[in-house]
Amino acid sequence: DGKFPNLALMKISTYHKLNGDNVDFATIGDYDKLYISKLFKFSELNLNTLITANETIVGGSGYDLSVHLPNEIEICEPDYSIYPMYDFSLQFYSRGCIRNCPFCIVRQKEGNIKSVKPMALNPNGNRIEVLDNNFFANPDWKLAIDDLLSTKQTVNLHGVDVRIINEEQAYWLNKLKHHKQIHI
């Protein structure tokens, strides 16, 4: 769907590997099971006719907001090995949002903001893409900053709501090594 590896597919990969299955990120071949995920409704579904599978499972918010990964998969750490071309980590410190913008599906999909346990980082990563929808609305934002500082990696924050940021948060935001501009 975009410039990032698909987190759901990475967790599905870990789940299957933990259960003794062989996992490939496939563009060609015959498989027992094929997973297809898309984040956005407008994303084209490019079903490659060079892939055949006994079972095909499609999912993601681009298909149906009400369907979620089963808990036994959701709790798995991401398997970055299926995306060797990415040299960064994805991270969430919160899910959901305090806003309910009419153009956005986050509140419908994830509910109100809540802190979540950080995921394992990409062992080959050199920066962290923090994908929280509203980083400083997280009641545990300071723990998130501490965690980011402890990694000594550059950070790209994707959700900073300048309408709610206070002086203390601005101070700690300035302590991070930023990879790019902060996304507001």
What annotation goes with each model-predicted range?
Residues 1-58, 63-64:
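A short, structured N-terminal alpha-helical element that caps or precedes a catalytic domain
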Residues 2-3, 39-43, 62-65, 97-99, ...:
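Short, solvent-exposed loop/turn segments at secondary-structure junctions
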Residues 8, 84-124:
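Canonical Radical SAM [4Fe-4S] cluster-binding loop centered on the CxxxCxxC motif
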Residues 16, 97, 101, 130, ...:
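Conserved, mostly hydrophobic/aromatic
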Residues 31-35, 102, 126-128, 180:
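Conserved acidic residues
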Residues 34, 46, 65-72, 83, ...:
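Short, charged, surface-exposed secondary-structure boundary motifs
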Residues 55-81:
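Ser/Thr/Gly-rich flexible loops in soluble cytosolic domains mediating phosphotransfer, phosphorylation
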Residues 123-184:
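Conserved SAM/AdoMet-binding glycine-rich loop
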